[in-house]
Amino acid sequence: MANQGMGPIMVLNSKTQRSTGRQAQLGNIQAARAVADIIRSTLGPRSMLKMLLDPMGGIVITNDGNCILREVDVSHPTAKSMIELSRAHDEEVGDGTTSVIILAGEMLINAEPFVRTNIHPTIIVRGYNYALQEALTICEEWALVVDVHDSERVKSLVQSCIGAKFSSRWNDIMIDMALKAVLTVSRESRTPSFTPEANDVYAQKMEVDIKRYAKVEKIPGGEISDCAVLSGVMFNKDVTHSKMRRRIENPRILLLDTPLEYKKGESQTNVEITDEEDWNTLLKMEEEYVENMCMEIIAFKPDIVITEKGVSDLAQHYFAKANITAFRRLRKTDNNRVARATGATIVSRTDEIRESDIGTGCGLFEMRKIGEEYFAFFEECKDPKACTIILRGGSKDVLNEIERNLTDAMQVVRNVVFDPRLLPGGGATEMAVSVGLRKAGLKLEGIQQGPFLAVGDAMEVIPRTLAQNCGVSVIRTVTQLRAKHAAAYEDSETSGNGTFPKCNWGIDGTTGKLVDMEEFGVWEPFSVKVQTIKTAVESACMILRIDDIVSGSKKKGY
């Protein structure tokens, strides 16, 4: 042949690192195992804290899985993918980040024997996806519908979700604040539903924008018991003039996003002045322009004027003379919250103000000094769809950790408002899915049975980790729990009623004992649990299908 004797042809750069086939797959599994092991001890009420040093020399002490992984610097691409998975899951449902990483890692660990025995990844993925559908069916049959306005049930749900957090001593305060904040900002969506079940409870769409309308204001000092949710909003601004009123009952509020000062030219402007009269004319025109704007505002008799832009000294003079309190350079986000809480409409031009734009929903405006800062409070609002959460604590580290925990609690309440269904916690759901998949897997034949059963085995990692973090005998506890769920299956099959057996037994994360989760009052949102299982299985399938990793070399100067 003509090509005999030719040297090897180099397609990739000689500096490029490449791993393929089984080597790449096993490397990915080991990387996923390492990431899961980092946060394994942070699951449950008996979780350990992690101390992390950021690149700037700051210290972060937390047991929040997403926060830990965000601070960890990794180099392996699969480890980076797992960390991105945690971040995406946190944005989607706001809770369960630790569980999803541990579960995804266990799915990949259980796939390792199949990879080593040269079973094709597509067959493993097919078995995993089949098991996922079966697991979701089990969760659907097991879900319990809850009334969102039953505050005691919702509180017990949030308690079980944030009981492991650093602020567990003040759980009652945190839960009450989360519940009040979410119910304050939630409102029915005006988007029409086109589903056939439009009248069903699950089809009711709620708009709960806690990121935009539930502002957390952290003020160092005081005690954690001083934390509160305002029935209105507050922001860190002082009035523009010392003679303006600092306390007003039932104020009329006008919101602007236009400057109350002479408008500057948008492009460079040159004016030639030949004598003093021209200069005086220019100054007079500026004063008249500002005066006209102020008179247009004063005509509507507002008590408070808030603008996102500047307020000139002359405008302050007119407002103080008219007994109007003014604020300037307020953030757009804060202005939107004030608008939503007081019923005001943000106006762009003073000559377009209408009576309907004035907000009258606020019951009390007051300036207060906390520490060395002045804060404007808009309280006692009639129907505030926005709120401010005031957090007090001894140090910034404590405040940051409390904020993370409160955010988790609000996400839990938000998820229940969106989908008012619950599943038992404490590893009960995972063990039920595990036993259910084992029973269903025995009916399968062929090579897919192994991967299908591997998903069932992987689901046990949650109750196993809970028992491990409690310091009890893991083998004895998990075996007893598995036996209880298996016995429920046997009873269901013997009775022949065809329904899915509801065994609510799980692990008490504090003592490590087996308890009935329904009596114990530990529940988790249906949407979080289902999304955790979906994300874990789908990410494991994605990583298993990677058979080639090519690492490009960086160019010089970059």
UniProtKB/Swiss-Prot annotation:
GO terms for molecular function: ATP binding; ATP hydrolysis activity; ATP-dependent protein folding chaperone; unfolded protein binding. Its main location: cytoplasm. Coiled coil: none annotated. It is found in: Cytoplasm. It holds the Pfam family Cpn60_TCP1. One of its GO terms (cellular component) is chaperonin-containing T-complex. SUPFAM superfamilies: GroEL apical domain-like, GroEL equatorial domain-like, GroEL-intermediate domain like. NCBIfam families: chap_CCT_gamma (TIGR02344), thermosome_alpha (NF041082), thermosome_beta (NF041083). This is T-complex protein 1 subunit gamma. It comes from Thalassiosira weissflogii. The lineage of its organism: Eukaryota, Sar, Stramenopiles, Ochrophyta, Bacillariophyta.
